Amino acid sequence: PGALIPRPETAELIDWIISDYTDKAGVRILDVGTGSGCIPIVLGKKLKDSKITSWDVSEKALDIARRNKLLNQVDITLAQVDIFDTALPDIHVDVLVSNPPYITEKERSGMERNVLDWEPELALFVPDSDPLLFYRRIAEVGCDILVSGGTLYYEINRAYGKETVQLLEGMGYQSVELRKDMFGNDRMIKAFRP
């Protein structure tokens, strides 16, 4: 297994971005932790004039994303980037989106066997001691690469909705909105860079 299997909750996040940007031309988008490439591929098909870049630390995931990009004939720039590196590519975007690892180790025992058997741990788990690890780092990067008024979108762990909102507000993001998924769980966040 090289990437997560796309889920309905991720489709809801994608729909939110499309509804916000469908009438805007030339939207510059960065997807962090692209995995299979499902987020940028759908955005590339629906937001026609968009310029999309996708990063992932895993070469296996990028191979899957490359194949999916070719199958779907979408123009996406894929790059192997570790979000925790201090020297990141110089990029400025209108939208930063991520469905990063967010399952804590203590939640592992309650997971379905097929997820553990078929999806990479690298894309799933965060330490119990720092469940917001990726959200914090991606938001830090967002402060540098999002244009003023740019939008940050996250898929989140339902157990940490309020904490993720507080994190973003504490970092200066504005109009932070927490949304529930189709199952009634806190699952998505949108926030603006001032």
Describe each region flagged by the PLM:
Residues 17, 43, 115, 138, ...:
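Class I S-adenosylmethionine-dependent transferase superfamily signal
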